[in-house]
A protein has these predicted regions:
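Short helix-coil junctions and helix-kink-helix linkers
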Residues: 236-238
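Non-catalytic DNA-recognition/assembly elements of restriction-modification systems
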Residues: 274
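Mobile late-domain/C-terminal helix-loop "cap" segments
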Residues: 253-257
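Catalytic cores of RNA-modifying enzymes
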Residues: 1-222, 248-252, 262, 271, ...
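Active-site-proximal catalytic alpha-helix in oxidoreductases
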Residues: 225-228
Length: 299
């Protein structure tokens, strides 16, 4: 039975507001499970199970599957279908749950069994937000396999001199690689662009040692805040720093002030973050010292 026939039989329609495009080729479903190297010992968190086609493949291979679906109609159908299985269906927005909370719902116990893997066919419009949510979570998955727009896959895996905020956000936490591309014709309804399967092998520890991850990404966002601008300009404006402070930090990090954000490597961003923190702390300490200096009563 085709995807369209399945939807018609269940009285369902693809919801544009949730960016729903359903895979029609069973071989691709197997490719996704292969990319995640799913085994009977695995706990899988699936995001956006849709009609449950990938869920069935995962359930045949994994020890346990927890699938979170935002569409209430689809979630209800899935609950009926997988009632007596190793699959738990959670109705809700994945961004409103910590991954550990979803796993605990699936396990029926606390704490949830760990480690785990994430498998998802992500809606194009919310890909970045979901990836950030998963990769910044504690605990983190060991592996993330996602179907995304091909252009997004290319942005995630790019290297200097074509870096971008998404690439840094992903590569800070994981090694990313494109496993295969998928033609638009493999989906119903057919999207306007091709897709790709991307595998993220999540680091146990980030390759960069930064004291404050939030501050690190604040600096990176500032660097990319004005496209095609030189770093000394975009950082000064984005961080609200004096130009001389930014210039000093760039010099300490041994980064040419005229370079652009997309040319920096991850280690260079780490060095720049450390340098900016050092310079700004020094500036604050110096200002505080001036404020608290004992006044000269002889004048």
């Amino acid at each position: 039975m085709s995807v369209k026939e399945t939807l018609d039989m269940r009285g369902l329609r693809p919801q544009k507001k949730w960016g729903q495009h359903f895979l029609t080729d069973p071989r691709i479903l197997e490719s996704i499970a292969d990319a995640a190297e799913v085994t009977p010992s695995d706990i899988i968190l699936e995001i956006g199970p849709g009609l449950g086609h990938l869920t069935r493949v995962l359930a045949q291979r994994a020890g346990r599957v927890v699938a979170v679906e935002v569409d209430g109609d689809l979630a209800a159908k899935l609950r009926d279908e997988f009632a007596a299985s190793n699959v738990t269906i959670v109705r809700g927005d994945v961004l409103r749950f910590k991954p550990i909370e979803l796993l605990e719902l699936g396990a029926g116990t606390s704490p949830a069994p760990l480690p785990f893997k994430v498998v998802a066919n992500l809606p194009y419009y919310i890909t970045s937000a979901i990836l950030r949510h998963i990769l910044e979570a504690v605990p983190k998955p060991r592996v993330v396999v996602v179907m995304v727009q091909r252009e997004v896959a290319q942005r995630m895996t790019t290297q200097p001199p074509a870096m971008n905020l998404l690439a840094i956000s992903v590569q800070f936490f994981a090694q990313a690689r494109v496993m295969r591309t998928i033609a638009a014709g493999a989906f119903y309804p057919r999207p306007k662009v091709d897709s790709a399967i991307v595998r993220l092998d999540v680091f146990e520890r980030p390759p960069l040692s930064v004291e404050d991850t939030a501050r690190f990404f604040e600096i990176v966002r500032a660097g990319f805040g004005e496209r095609r601008k030189q770093l000394h300009n975009s950082l000064a404006r984005g961080l609200g720093c004096a130009p001389e402070v930014v210039a000093t930090a760039l010099a300490r990090a041994r980064i040419d002030a005229t370079r652009r954000a997309e040319t920096l490597t991850l280690p260079e961003w780490g060095a720049l973050c450390d340098a900016l923190e050092s310079v700004t702390h020094f500036s604050r300490d110096e200002s505080n010292a001036e404020l608290h200096k004992t006044p000269n009563l002889d004048n």
